[in-house]
């Protein structure tokens, strides 16, 4: 088995993680308890991509709009489509991040880091200020990655435990509570 086949075989894990994360974000009104980090806020917004099938028979469903309009994406889950891309806004403390997460490769796209006093000031040309700004941005990237990694670890703890069956039942119930979307 080559590397590409291995990625394809394991992509379901990222799709399950993204679906679990979406459910967790709605379970407590956007607040997710993360051990060691406290509560963080997660909002799935604007853009989702769902997939079904493989090869030439693959179908893609792109859902975009306001949070309320993402009902079509939940309807897609009901008919067996898998969440592949999602735009997420995450708030941890005073820092608000926005990014797209691609499930199959756990790839980040279109990352927006929080605005800080350092990044909002006019460029002074001062080397120390520039170095400070770069270090601050590196810190913010690391904070984002560490937080998403902690969320993934939390998911794996449940997914690989006997607690997965009750959790899966809750997720299925959440998916099925959405009325099937019939566009007029």
Which stretches of residues belong to each language-model region?
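Intrinsically disordered, low-complexity, charge-rich terminal extensions
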Residues: 1-184
């Amino acid at each position: 088995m080559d590397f590409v086949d291995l990625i394809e075989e394991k992509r379901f894990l990222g799709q399950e993680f993204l679906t679990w994360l979406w459910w967790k974000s709605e379970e407590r009104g956007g607040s997710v308890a993360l051990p060691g980090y406290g509560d963080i806020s997660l909002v799935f917004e604007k853009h989702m991509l769902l997939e079904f099938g493989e090869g030439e028979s693959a179908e893609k469903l792109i859902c975009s709009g306001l949070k309320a309009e993402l009902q079509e994406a939940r309807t897609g889950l009901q008919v067996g489509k898998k969440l592949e891309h999602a735009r997420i806004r995450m708030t941890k403390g005073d820092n608000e991040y926005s990014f797209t997460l691609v499930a199959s490769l756990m790839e980040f796209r279109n990352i927006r880091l929080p605005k800080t006093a350092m990044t909002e000031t006019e460029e002074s040309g001062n080397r120390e200020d520039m170095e400070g700004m770069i270090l601050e941005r590196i810190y913010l990237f690391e904070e984002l990655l560490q937080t998403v990694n902690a969320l993934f670890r939390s998911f794996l703890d449940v997914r690989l435990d006997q607690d997965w069956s009750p959790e899966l039942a809750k997720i299925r119930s959440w998916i099925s509570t959405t009325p099937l979307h019939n566009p007029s």
